[in-house]
């Protein structure tokens, strides 16, 4: 394998990552529900992102018809949950969750996104997540302005200077600082834990400071309204953020995902890809949890979740005869590009680490 050209290596990687949706198929234990266990009586509480609670309610109703003795409800209290789906899990909190090696076919997942505690798997990735600049081409077309692709492009754009790009703290870390730190030698584990050396972090923050000082990128805790109304040249945010506001965009909008804006010409475009990951608490009824997790990762339920949420799955699924949203094509075209280096990351940052990183980022934007 060491003799393969970088291009061939990229193509092989895409077979199991960027084209994950299309390469999978129904496996023996993923196509239908099992009938055994229908007599199991237990309660499960699920905590997940409010955005896809409705989608989970539909899955729960379908599951309940097969297992009427299992009571499953949603909760907003993650400490009360038997099943938690979250995009961040620190090592200390992870101690409260069970081993999941036998609850799903591990080969169906992106290996780097499986959350491990030592040699044991305690988290199964459900949805992919990533951050980068999203651009609506419509305002650029109106102003006859070129759409920027690289770092130098935004400095040379009068449209961007007049309509600064916006970002929140998480977008700035995952879409700007982390990719630059990777270019300087940081590993996926380094940026996932947030435990970056002072030297690496300084290099990652240097270009962000230059961008902040120029005024062409501004920090905002609520940039969505400006993006929808075309009052900003771009939004440095997560895929989930875009999905939430997509239905509010003008019909003539054309959304473009451009993670390379943090990189200069000639530099690698690094794209950290994370996941919303499923964890099962040790206190949960083991049999009930196993039944639900197995059912959740069946092809039929994953397809139902894709349809309802428009979120890209982190597990192989057979999508034949199933139309995919336009936003999917934009996302996967970037993910599959040979110009982009995909770096899979499990976010294990502690609250204190996130707070420290936020303070550093805030200091760059202080007037």
Regions found by a protein language model. Give the residues of each.
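Periplasmic solute-binding protein
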Residues: 111-147, 168-191, 272-280, 356-358
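Paired acidic/hydrophobic, glycine-rich loop segments that form the ligand-binding mouth/hinge
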Residues: 82-85, 233-238
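Conserved N-terminal structural module of periplasmic/extracytoplasmic solute-binding proteins
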Residues: 1-4, 9-14, 19-90, 304, ...
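A ligand-binding cleft/hinge motif common to bilobed small-molecule-binding domains
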Residues: 89-94, 236-253
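Extracytoplasmic/periplasmic substrate-recognition and gating elements
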Residues: 248-313
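Long, aromatic- and glycine/proline-rich binding clefts that accommodate carbohydrate-like moieties
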Residues: 306-365
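Hinge/lid segment of periplasmic solute-binding proteins
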Residues: 87-132, 143, 256-261
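Glycine-centered hinge/linker elements that transmit conformational signals in sensory
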Residues: 191-221, 246
């Amino acid at each position: 394998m060491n003799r393969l050209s970088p291009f061939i290596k990229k193509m092989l990687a895409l077979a199991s990552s960027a084209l994950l949706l299309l390469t999978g198929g129904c496996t023996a234990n993923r196509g239908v529900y099992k009938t055994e266990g229908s007599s199991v009586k237990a309660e499960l509480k699920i905590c997940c992102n409010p955005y896809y609670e409705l989608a989970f309610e539909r899955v729960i109703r379908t599951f309940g018809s097969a297992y009427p003795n299992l009571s499953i409800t949603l909760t907003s209290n993650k400490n009360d949950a038997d099943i938690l789906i979250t995009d961040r899990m620190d090592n200390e909190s992870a101690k409260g969750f069970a081993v999941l090696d036998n609850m799903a076919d591990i080969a169906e997942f992106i290996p780097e996104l499986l959350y491990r505690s030592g040699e044991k798997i305690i988290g199964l990735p459900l949805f992919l997540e990533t951050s980068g600049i999203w651009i609506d081409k419509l305002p650029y077309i109106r102003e006859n302005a070129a759409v920027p692709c690289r770092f130098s492009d935004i400095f040379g754009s009068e449209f961007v200077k007049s309509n600064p790009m916006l970002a929140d703290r998480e977008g700035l870390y995952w879409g700007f600082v982390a990719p630059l730190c990777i270019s300087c030698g940081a590993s996926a584990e380094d940026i996932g834990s947030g435990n970056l050396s002072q030297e690496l972090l300084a290099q990652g923050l240097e270009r962000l400071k230059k961008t902040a000082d120029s005024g062409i990128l501004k920090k905002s805790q609520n940039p969505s309204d400006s993006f929808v109304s075309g009052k900003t040249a771009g939004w440095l945010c997560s895929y989930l953020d875009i999905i939430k506001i997509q239905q509010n965009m003008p019909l003539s909008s054309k959304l473009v995902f451009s993670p390379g804006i943090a990189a200069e010409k000639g530099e690698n475009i690094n794209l950290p890809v994370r996941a919303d990951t499923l964890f099962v608490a040790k206190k949960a009824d083991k049999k009930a949890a196993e039944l639900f997790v197995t059912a959740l990762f069946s092809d039929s339920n994953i397809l139902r979740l894709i349809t309802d949420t428009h979120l890209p799955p982190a597990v192989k699924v057979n999508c034949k005869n199933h139309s995919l949203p336009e936003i999917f094509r934009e996302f996967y075209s970037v993910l599959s590009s040979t110009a982009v280096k995909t770096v899979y990351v499990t976010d294990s940052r502690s609250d204190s680490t996130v707070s420290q990183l936020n303070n550093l980022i805030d200091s760059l934007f202080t007037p």
